[in-house]
Amino acid sequence: MNKDILLCGVGGQGTVLASKLIASAAMRCGNVVHSAETIGMAQRGGSVISHIRIGERAASPLIPRGNADILIAFEPAEAVRNLPYLKKESVVIVNSTPVKPTTEALQETGYDGTEMIAYLKKKADCVILDGEALLKKAGSARCFNMIVLGALA
């Protein structure tokens, strides 16, 4: 099996932990796995991207643009930012609840993620998760990455 999975979000959402769990599960199933993270601003709220390449053919742990089979996005704007990594007929799993960047919090530009979700629906096959509602049911924001991994399964 060859599969390229890109996870993206912002610092503090559990993106890296989710990628490590996927990689670990794939290795336990006997697959060769390459993974890497690119973490922007190295702080809560900075952009985080995790690359997971499952299969023998991967020469690099970084997924080239146009090669990802699945994009798992913990934040709508990060999903749009990382769309160029997807190949045709890929799937996007995205949390519809936005994390407002500092600039939005200061300027109140009205960012609520709805325009990003509408754009994503036009560009890819999407599974939209209402993060806010799911977290209320789960009772803890700390388990959201597990909810997203359930959607991947």
Language model features by range: what are they?
Residues 1-153:
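Active-site cofactor/cluster-binding pocket
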